[in-house]
Amino acid sequence: YKRQLPVSFPRSVGNLPAYYNRHPSAFGLRYINADNEPLYPFGFGLSYTTFEYGKPKLSTKEMTVDGSVLLSVKVKNTGSVEGKEVVQLYVRDDLSTVTRPIKELKGFKKIFLKPGEEQIVRFTVDRTTLKYFNRKMQEVVEPGTFTLMVGPNSTDLQDIKFIVK
C-alpha cells in the first residue's frame, strides 16, 4: 500500500522554502547550478506497484461562472500487485485581478486497483472549486482561462485548460 507525504522535502537547505501556494512571478524561483524540483514533492509516495495516468479530458472547454465542468482521467495499475493510489487535482487561475497561487490542491480521490485494472477518476469543477476572495473580501469567480492539473503528486502533473465565461 502506498503512503504519501503531507509536505515537500527540498533537495538542499539552499532550496528553502519549498512551497507551491506562492505568487506567480515572471522570474520564478530558480537557483543557479541547482535542481529546482523538490527531492520529494507533496503527495509523493512509494508503492509495491506502479500506476499510469492517461491524458485528462473535459466534458466541455467552456463553462459559465455558475456552471460546472467534469474532468476525467484514466488511471491504470501497471504493476503485478494490487495497490492504492491518490489522484490529486490542482487548479490555477491563469489571469486574475488578485494575485493567485501557481497551483492549489482542490481535490483528491483515493482508488484501489488490482493488477492490470484501470479506472476513470472524475472531478466536478464548479464555482466552489474556483472561487476566491477578491480585494473587497467577496467570494468571486472571475471569467478567464483556468488550468486544471491532475496527477499522483504536486510535481508529476498533466494539465488541461478551460475557459470560464
Question: What residue ranges belong to the model's regions?
Answer:
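Short, conserved secondary-structure segments in the cores of folded domains
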Residues: 59, 107-109, 137
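Terminal connector regions
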Residues: 126-165
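Surface-exposed loops/turns
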Residues: 65, 115, 142-143
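Short acidic, flexible loop segments centered on an aromatic residue
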Residues: 80-97, 103-105
